[in-house]
A protein has these predicted regions:
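Short hydrophobic beta/alpha edge segments that flank linear recognition/processing sites
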Residues: 58-74, 99, 106-112
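Generic structural motif
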Residues: 20, 55, 78-86
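Short, conserved beta-turn/loop elements at beta-strand boundaries and strand-helix junctions
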Residues: 25-28, 86-93
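Short, charged/polar surface micro-motifs in flexible loops or helix N-caps
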Residues: 40-41, 81-84, 90-91
């Protein structure tokens, strides 16, 4: 698993580095979406997650939910547009799960994307994510996850 400054970035995911979001194809035409370890470390302990509801549309580049920590409130922006088909209710009930386990238990929503093939070229594969994330962390002045 690639790691940048102590932040794990699993190689089986696709990344929107600019927005600190990961995507995992589910094999049924849907994609699971979550925040990277970098995002959760930068935000601090999450205290609230308000997702778009099941059945709601998400426009590409827009929010699939709002996250809040003690020092930050903001959108989780999805590079893909589509319909929310599943919400992580466990994360709604206990948002800090994303801090402890951003890639398994701490996912945000599952989306049925409208045009996934057009989004793929903009995402970075896990095998290639180290250099872009190193540059992103430099530009944001983030020392790392540890």
């Amino acid at each position: 698993m690639p790691s940048v400054r102590g932040c794990n970035l699993p190689d089986d995911l696709l990344y929107d580095v600019d927005n600190h979001i990961w995507f995992q194809e589910q094999g049924d035409g849907t994609v699971k979406i979550g925040m990277t370890a970098v995002a959760t470390a930068m935000a601090g302990k999450l205290v609230a997650f308000t997702p778009k509801r099941v059945g709601r549309s998400v426009r590409a580049g827009k929010s699939c939910g709002t996250l809040e920590s003690g020092k930050w409130v903001g959108p989780a922006k999805s590079a893909a547009g589509g319909e929310v088909v599943v919400v992580n209710d466990d994360l709604v009930a206990n948002p800090s799960i994303a801090n402890d386990d951003p890639y398994e238990a701490g996912w945000l929503v599952i989306l049925k994307p409208e045009d996934w093939d057009s989004v793929l070229p903009a995402l970075v594969t896990g095998n290639d994510v180290t250099a872009p994330y190193e540059a992103k962390m430099d530009s944001e002045g983030f020392a790392g996850c540890e």
